[in-house]
Amino acid sequence: MKMTRRDFLNVSTAAAVVCAATLLPVEKAAAAQQTLAAQNLLEQAYLYAFPLVIMDATRTASTNTRTATSNKAPINQFIHAEKLADATTRAVVTPNVDTIYTQAFLDVGAEPMIYGVPQTDRFFNVQVLDAWTNTAAVLETPGLYAITRADWQGELPEGVQRIDVPTTMVWTIARIVLSGQEDLPNVRAIQDKMQLMPLSAYQAGGWTAPTGSYDPANDFVPVKHVLAMDAKEFFDAANQLMETNPPAAADAPVLRELAALHVGLGEKFDDKALGLFSGLRWKLMLLQLKKKLQSESERYTRQMGQWIYFGDPIGNFGTAYTYRTMVALRGLGANTTDVAIYPKTDVDSTGTVLTGKKTYTLHIEADPPTLEKGFWSVTAYGENDFLIENPIDRYCVNDRSGLHRNPDGSIDITLSKEAPADTTNWLPVGEGDFHLFLRIYKPDAAALTEWQPPVVRAN
C-alpha cells in the first residue's frame, strides 16, 4: 500500500506529458480543477464509508471462532474478557486497566436479541453501537432488553424493554469496573449472570449457543486489513454493507455527491469512475489521510488545564464524517462524553515533553467530580501507546488504589522510573517519553467547569 518515489514520479510525469501534449493553457487549468475535484470526492467517499467497513472487519475477526473464548466468540455470543491488560498487551493501543469488557457482535436482521443486564454493586454499563459506530443506547438499569432493528414489527414479552438500532449489525460493549486482580472473581460472577439469546429462544425457554466457524483468512488485524484494501475491494464492501446497514437520512446530501463514484446504497462501484491512474490516486489519498485526520481532530479538541480530550459529537457523530473516521482509527467504540471523557497530557506545567529521565509530581487538588457509581484513574503509557513494564506491575492509580492523601484531601502522585522510598503513591514510567490519560467515567459535566484539573510539575 506504500507509494514509492518511483510511483509518485510515474503518476506526476504521466499526467504532465498528457496535459502538455494535448491541452491548451485554459484547458490545462480546467483539467487540473477536474482532477482536484475527483481527488476530493474520492477522499470524501473514503472518509464517509471507513467506519462501516472497519466495523465489519472487526466483526469478522472477532467472530472468527468455533466456540467462545476470552477474545473471540461466534455471532450473537458473549466474548467475556478474563483479565486486565498489562505491559504485554498488544491487541489495542492505550488499553484500559479500570474495567473488564464483555463484548458481542449481534445480527438482528432476522429477530431481536434479548440482552439481560444483572443487578450489580458497581459501575456497569452496556454501550450499544450501530454499524456506523454511533451509540444507539447505553444500558445501565438491571433488566431485560430487546436489541431490535428499528424497522422490526412484532410483540415483545412483558417486562422486556425495546432498544431500536438502525442497522442489522450491532456491537455491544459491557464495561465492568474492578479494584484490581483480587476483584476478578466478583467480576466473573457478574459476567455469569449476563444473558444473551434470540427472542425466539427466550420465548421457548432456553437456548444452546450454536457452533461458529473458523477461517484462517479472517485472522487479521482489522485496521491493517482495511487500510490494505484497494479502491474496488473497499467500496464493494461498503456498498454491500449498506444494503443491511442503511445510511442515516441526514446522509442524503453527501450520498448524492458520492453517486458520481457509484458509492452508496444500491450502487455498484466501478473503479473506472476514478479516471486515469486510479490506483496511484488511491495510494496518494491514503498517504495524505493522516494529515487530514490530524487537522480535523483539532476542531473537536477540548482543553482542560494542561490536558486535552476529544469532545462532542464523539460517539454520536451525525454528519461529522471525518471526525467519525479519525475516532474509528484511534479508538473504535468510543463513549459519548456523558459516559466518559479521556483527557490526555504529554507535557508538564511548563509545556515540556514528559520523559522518564526526570521525576515529576502529579498534584490532584480534588477528585474529578463524578455522578453515582462514577470513577477516575490516571494511566501512564510509553511512546508506543502501550502500558509501561515496571517491577510492581502497576500501570495506573485511581480512586480505588488506597492512595495517601494530604491533610487538605489533595493527592500527590510521583511519576518516575526509579521507585521512591514509599511506593504507595508511585506511578512507574519508563526511560523514554511518556504520556498520561486521565479517565473520568460518569463525569458531572456541570461541576467539571469549576473543577481544577491535575497539574504535572517536574521535581
PLM feature segments, named:
Residues 32-459:
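A compositional/structural signature for long, glycine/proline-rich flexible linkers
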Residues 2-7, 16-33:
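N-terminal twin-arginine translocation
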